Amino acid sequence: VTAGGVPVVDHGTLALGRRLGQGGQGTVYEVTNKRVTPPQGGGWDAVYKEYTPPVLAQLDVAALETLVGLPGGSTAAQGQWLCERTAWPAAVVRRQGVTCGFLMRAVPERFMFDLRGLGNTVVGRHLANMEYLLNDDAYVAGIGLVVSDRDRFQLLADLAETLDRFHAMGVTVGDLSPKNLLFTTAPRPACFFIDCDAVRLRGATALPQAETPDWEVPAGERKATPASDAYKLALLAVRLLGRHQTSTDPAALASYSPELGRLARAGLGHDPAARPEPGQWTAPLKAASRKASTRPAQGNARPGRPRTGAPPGGAGTGTPPPRRTQGVGVAVAVALGLAALLVLEAQDDDTASAPGASAG
């Protein structure tokens, strides 16, 4: 069913499976009888995010509907790209005519990894949040991640290109942080955005803008603008190459490439108009990647303690440092599901398909 070209699903038609996660904004459930399909075909299993009553009281329903309608209102190629690379809301869900949440796709398997703990044992499958990479190489290798310097530069280049395309579409991320970014290194380094119901689209935002601690723009600056995204891209570049979660010192980045050091210093400046746009980072990052080591980070069999923000349970859990506030969504809670798409296809209730399977 569509309303004004926006896919709408009645809550009563959803066959909900297990609860996948719960966060400050709501709860995410497996959906066993729906599929989400992007503009150019293919499809993924669906999950459902139900907002809490306090969040619903702040929700701009029209802005959420505009987000859902963006892939279909773009060119087929552009909509497909958005659906494949981001957690874009796929359909509005209503209960008795009132919006209560939205559908989204399952996280691609390649953006998850086998988390290892004490004794090099596999703890389970976890989202590959970029936050894990803001620690020293011994910790990264110890929890089971295989990442080289070249991978880090290529991840940043992919992120810069993605932000550049976002901005051309009128999308600003706002709460751009490693908690809201997933990554993979195979078949090539790439990022995947989650918590996309929190972005700003053409000036409108479905939810009040919030920021992850230590990833805030300078005081007094408007949130979720191209300039704020540029600031946080510079922060991430500094911290990803510096293996640090709170640093603002571009020295480590500059040691790889003086040009990248200059971009970082300009990007962290307090004059929003003087910050380099994401597209200006792409070529220098790719150039640095060609010179960077391809040797994966090495570590001990037991994961070490993260340099900052270690989890309360101590090292060895492999858990990224916890968010100190409620945050912008159910980023980690969304463990298995995110959004992207347009057309919803019903399946037989007893035939839930595997993640990544094509629609049929």
Per-region residue spans from a language model:
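Conserved protein kinase catalytic/activation segment
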Residues: 180-196
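Regulatory extensions appended to serine/threonine kinase catalytic cores
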Residues: 293-340
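Conserved N-terminal boundary motif of the eukaryotic protein kinase catalytic domain
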Residues: 9-19
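ATP-binding glycine-rich loop module of kinase domains
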Residues: 25-92, 98-101, 106-144
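Terminal C-lobe "cap" of eukaryotic-type protein kinase domains
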Residues: 269-294
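Catalytic-loop of the protein kinase fold
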Residues: 154-156, 163, 167-185
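C-lobe/activation-segment region of protein kinase-like
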Residues: 191-192, 196-266
